[in-house]
UniProtKB/Swiss-Prot annotation:
The keyword Acetylation does not apply. It comes from the Eukaryota. GO terms for molecular function: G protein-coupled receptor activity; odorant binding; olfactory receptor activity. The keyword Isomerase does not apply. It comes from Homo sapiens (Human). This is Olfactory receptor 11L1. Keywords: Cell membrane, Disulfide bond, G-protein coupled receptor, Glycoprotein, Membrane, Olfaction, Receptor, Sensory transduction, Transducer, Transmembrane, Transmembrane helix. Glycans are attached at residue 5. It is a multi-pass membrane protein. Residues 1-25, 76-99, 161-197, 259-271 are extracellular. It is found in: Cell membrane. Odorant receptor.
Amino acid sequence: MEPQNTSTVTNFQLLGFQNLLEWQALLFVIFLLIYCLTIIGNVVIITVVSQGLRLHSPMYMFLQHLSFLEVWYTSTTVPLLLANLLSWGQAISFSACMAQLYFFVFLGATECFLLAFMAYDRYLAICSPLRYPFLMHRGLCARLVVVSWCTGVSTGFLPSLMISRLDFCGRNQINHFFCDLPPLMQLSCSRVYITEVTIFILSIAVLCICFFLTLGPYVFIVSSILRIPSTSGRRKTFSTCGSHLAVVTLYYGTMISMYVCPSPHLLPEINKIISVFYTVVTPLLNPVIYSLRNKDFKEAVRKVMRRKCGILWSTSKRKFLY
């Protein structure tokens, strides 16, 4: 009987998309472009909402926090993915891997709760417009935002702690582009049954409950839209809410398929593609869907741009004169 390699793993190697060697350069350009657009779009939202006088309603407070979250959420995984595409296999230390895992779970859970509260906010704004200022005031909005962040922070601790206590011996190659829960549990040489059950229950508690809390208000919104007598008003409102619902469904659908209902028959490469949707694609779509289709927000962007351009012009003119 051959002796088993029980040496403790101190670092991991992320394999990424090594089976697509001929597409590495193209994938790098695509992911880099998406990452840059995501950062720019969300930073624009944060800047415009903080400076726009008409954008201080609860809806835009939620949006500002969502954009701030998306910047960090996508930065947790994408830079390492880009480095992986350039080096064909990125090494990451054990502590850095656990840190990435924690921030991924923490920010992902926070986004779930934020999306649920934003759906409730949209429900009140559309279905109870006259009572909306009294029901969703800035104090309540601030408390809901704090609840989202605090719940996300606490949610990230348990999975990260349980994974960090597992033994990793011998193999250190993670068949993924970031330190995710399923591939780490597959790599461990410990018994992971309790860890799997705990993460499964936690995934149901966060993903499924938040999904139904997000979906519920949109059901009432759709029924309210169908009662709007104006065809143009109904079409415009339905288009906006339909876009929100499409992005929410994409985000939750891919997450649930990975953590609540994983298929043992799916190839690791398919799981990586599914992961791309909730780590790369949805952070890009959120600023487009929630803000750039909004008339008030686009007007605020134009005002901020005119103000910034005016300041730059006056500064350059003053330097030229002196």
